[in-house]
């Protein structure tokens, strides 16, 4: 058993069914442990339920049964939004950026939701600029997002995921919409951040190259999770 000092996430016996119109078992008795500083890749065929699992682990979706503990806190309906805001960062395939806002405003959005001051010169704004620097986009800070390329948008989404200094980042096909070269750069930035700052990463991908860069690989087959 892992020591609890480094365990950031523990999922136990997660089950998820959908009904349309008959019952379909999406996830069956899925259990997973993730340590601080660990990067976990979950691969599997399309339609296996990878994104559903990621959303459950990230507290965005409710399992039918099973337990989820993040940072030694058992997730419940009463604490999950606070835990999500304080401990979790998300990177989605489709970016989910606000197109009429600047790159910096998008990066600072989690801080704004958390009611932190994002005024010019504030520590939070300085952190936003530092994150844009880390992803190589400080020159684009005041550009509206709609003017930027797909690769730039995904790097902004990555910087935004890091804004509240989360302990764990969940990434759903983070390079799914990017060309090979841009995807490679994105993977480097993501993993450098995770390993350099002792964060944890759980990502869903069907890119074997990206999966190999992670410290642990799992495969979802017929609703069951297997370590590779």
Curated annotation (Swiss-Prot):
CDD domains: ABC_MJ0796_LolCDE_FtsE. Signal peptide: none annotated. GO terms for molecular function: ATP binding; ATP hydrolysis activity; transmembrane transporter activity. Keywords: ATP-binding, Cell inner membrane, Cell membrane, Membrane, Nucleotide-binding, Translocase, Transport. It is found in: Cell inner membrane. Residues 9-228 form the ABC transporter domain. ATP binds at residues 44-51. SUPFAM superfamilies: P-loop containing nucleoside triphosphate hydrolases. Pfam families: ABC_tran. It is an enzyme of class 7 (translocase). Its EC number is 7.6.2.-. It is a peripheral membrane protein. Transmembrane segments: none annotated. GO terms for cellular component: plasma membrane. Gene3D superfamilies: P-loop containing nucleotide triphosphate hydrolases. Belongs to the ABC transporter superfamily. Lipoprotein translocase (TC 3.A.1.125) family. Part of the ABC transporter complex LolCDE involved in the translocation of mature outer membrane-directed lipoproteins, from the inner membrane to the periplasmic chaperone, LolA. Responsible for the formation of the LolA-lipoprotein complex in an ATP-dependent manner. The complex is composed of two ATP-binding proteins (LolD) and two transmembrane proteins (LolC and LolE). This is Lipoprotein-releasing system ATP-binding protein LolD. It comes from Protochlamydia amoebophila (strain UWE25).
